[in-house]
Regions:
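ACP-dependent fatty acid/polyketide chain-elongation machinery
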Residues: 1-66, 244-256, 352-366, 410-415
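Condensing-enzyme catalytic core mediating Claisen C-C bond formation in acyl metabolism
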Residues: 4-8, 32-35, 214-290, 298-299, ...
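Conserved beta-ketoacyl condensing-enzyme motif
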Residues: 7, 20-23, 28-163, 191-200, ...
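Conserved small-residue
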Residues: 9, 27, 81, 103, ...
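A glycine- and small-aliphatic-rich helix-loop capping segment at beta-alpha/alpha-beta transitions
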Residues: 21-26, 112-127, 177-180, 200-213, ...
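Active-site-proximal alpha-helical scaffold in enzymes
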Residues: 77-90, 140-144, 148-192, 230-251, ...
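Glycine-/small-residue-rich "gating" segment that lines the acyl/pantetheine channel
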Residues: 124-131, 169-172, 176, 192-248, ...
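Acyl-CoA/ACP chain-elongation machinery
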Residues: 182-227, 260-274, 304-311, 328-379
Length: 415
């Protein structure tokens, strides 16, 4: 028998705050998490700004000995998983059968800082000086592995890697696994820590990043003057749980996950299909599986990267999937305008925003929106959050390689 799936725990480390609730409060306030890059000297770089995590010290959180053996992306993921487990009430030993608890946490690039540091060490000092922890710290599945070890999760584990759609696919695949009875609960999400010279140089070379040095206008999704995304970092982990298991233990339920679409454009390695057929089909699949009724109050947390190609293509995809009237009636926003693009973590933190929006009846804004673009003609909730009577939410994400994901959620009401 198919199971309904609830979100019962949330955890986040983001450019807006080092907890989920701090992040959500900042989203609702329209806070900009973008600022000058402090992780490295940008004198030789065209890109000057990013959305960095602030005030998170791995040495304080894990202790110096353990922190030095954890790449920053894993540190973020572990901290977010701790918060999510506590929020769900799973930090009590017998709260769940650990063989029925899984981990689906991915990363777009894994421990890139660790890899780069060791490449320089090997080049400068020879191969014998490579760290014995290098491989374990750099591989993108290590966030899932370390979370499983930390929380004794012995159920299904799947570290997803689909670039910018990573954690959306992680949430979707976790939803499917629980729906079909393979687990009672899964820690699902993603993490990234790639605001480093090498990643910024690479994204700049493929003309993906904005070179606007003004943090207050650098990230402006759907605006006519948008010119590239802003790198972000952090992690978000959600506890997805079967509804029956959640109700039996009296868990708090933020929202219900009801549908998932997973497609590929099969068009280009980095550019989205301008016809938007792939993302439209992902949305349609999620809507059909969840029996979503857009006329009953719909919020769409769009991928909205602030790139010329993505935002217009995604707008077309939303209209193609839902129809012009339903698309125009929906509340749409891009929280990347505040968090920057958190790459592997972005899908999960946007699903979190959808769940909180449904529970609290608040749509977070798209900040920095000033000049409408005729190719982006939906209601993007410009600059200020709005109250709304919401029943449904969609989170959409697109990744390099043509990967598309859509997650459908429904407001939970106890019957």
């Amino acid at each position: 028998m198919e199971q309904r799936v609830a979100i019962t725990g949330i955890g986040a480390v983001s450019p807006l705050g080092n907890t989920a609730l701090a992040t959500w409060a900042a989203m609702c306030a329209g806070t900009c998490g973008v600022g000058p890059i402090t992780h490295f000297d940008t004198d030789a770089f065209a890109v000057k700004v990013a959305a960095e995590v602030k005030g998170f010290d791995g040495n304080d959180y894990f202790g110096k000995h353990d922190a030095r053996h954890l790449d920053p992306c894993v540190q973020f993921a572990l901290a977010a998983s701790d918060e999510a487990m506590h929020d769900a009430g799973f930090d009590v030993e017998d709260a769940i059968d650990r063989e029925r608890l899984g981990v689906y946490v991915g990363s777009g690039v894994g421990g890139m800082q660790t890899l780069v540091d060791n490449v320089h060490t090997i080049a400068d000092r020879g191969p014998r000086r490579a760290s014995p922890y290098m491989i374990a710290m750099m591989i993108p599945n290590m966030a899932s592995g370390d979370i499983a070890i930390r929380h004794k999760a012995k159920g299904p584990t799947l570290p997803v890697v689909t670039a910018c759609a990573t954690s959306a696919h992680a949430v979707g695949e976790a939803f499917r696994a629980i729906k079909h009875g393979y687990a009672d609960a899964i820690l699902a999400g993603g993490t990234e820590a790639a605001i480093i010279p090498d990643a910024v140089a690479g994204f700049t070379s493929c003309r993906a990043l904005t070179t606007n040095p003004d943090p207050s206008t650098a990230c402006r999704p759907f605006d006519a003057n948008r010119d590239g995304f802003v790198m972000g970092e952090g992690a978000c982990v959600l506890v997805l749980e079967s509804m029956g298991h959640a109700l039996a233990r009296g868990a708090h339920i933020y929202a219900e996950v009801v549908g998932y679409g997973n497609t590929d454009d099969a068009y280009h390695i980095t550019s989205p299909d301008p016809e938007a057929a792939g993302i439209a089909r992902a949305i349609s699949l999620a809507v059909a599986e969840g029996d979503v009724k857009p006329s009953e109050g719909l919020y769409i947390n769009a991928h909205g990267t602030s790139t010329k190609l993505n935002d217009s293509s995604e707008t077309a995809g939303i209209k193609r999937a839902l129809g012009e009237d339903a698309a125009r009636a929906a509340h749409v926003s891009s929280t990347k305008s505040m968090t920057g693009h958190m790459i592997g973590a972005t899908g999960a933190i946007e699903v979190m925003a959808c769940a909180m929006a449904l529970e609290q009846g608040v749509v977070p804004p798209t900040i920095n929106y000033r000049t409408p673009d005729p190719a982006c003609d939906l209601d993007y909730t410009p600059n200020r959050a709005v109250r709304a009577d919401l029943t449904w939410a969609l989170s959409t994400n697109l990744g390099f390689g043509g990967h598309n994901a859509a997650i459908a959620l429904r407001r939970y009401t106890r019957s």
